[in-house]
């Protein structure tokens, strides 16, 4: 009977260790999910920022082209004079 009690206590200890390990792993999983969500939000923000910069860049290029056209027109008028 003492032998089976020892076996039972060892089994109980191993089960408790398994439960503790599972609990820790679940906590780790939740932490990693939160980090993953935060990173996904950062990626989304970065993509939005990039798109905004691309639009701004395109507008600036169009403005530059407009100014270059005006400058060429002015230079053409000066040559006529």
UniProtKB/Swiss-Prot annotation:
Q: Name one GO biological process term.
A: division septum assembly
One Gene Ontology CC term in the entry: cytoplasm
Q: Which residues form a coiled coil?
A: 5-81
Regions that span the bilayer: none
Q: Upper taxonomic classification of the species?
A: Bacteria, Pseudomonadati, Pseudomonadota, Gammaproteobacteria, Enterobacterales
Q: Which family does it belong to?
A: Belongs to the ZapB family.
Sorted UniProt keywords:
Cell cycle, Cell division, Coiled coil, Cytoplasm, Septation
Organism in which the protein naturally occurs? Enterobacter sp. (strain 638)
Q: Which residues form the signal peptide?
A: none
Q: What does this protein do?
A: Non-essential, abundant cell division factor that is required for proper Z-ring formation. It is recruited early to the divisome by direct interaction with FtsZ, stimulating Z-ring assembly and thereby promoting cell division earlier in the cell cycle. Its recruitment to the Z-ring requires functional FtsA or ZipA.
Q: Where in the cell is it found?
A: Cytoplasm
Record's subunit section: Homodimer. The ends of the coiled-coil dimer bind to each other, forming polymers. Interacts with FtsZ.
Q: Which domain of life is it from?
A: Bacteria
**Region of interest (Disordered), residue spans:** 43-64
Which residue ranges have biased composition labelled Basic and acidic residues?
49-59
Please name the Pfam families in this protein's record. Answer: ZapB
What name does the UniProt record give this protein? Cell division protein ZapB
UniProt-listed SUPFAM superfamilies: t-snare proteins
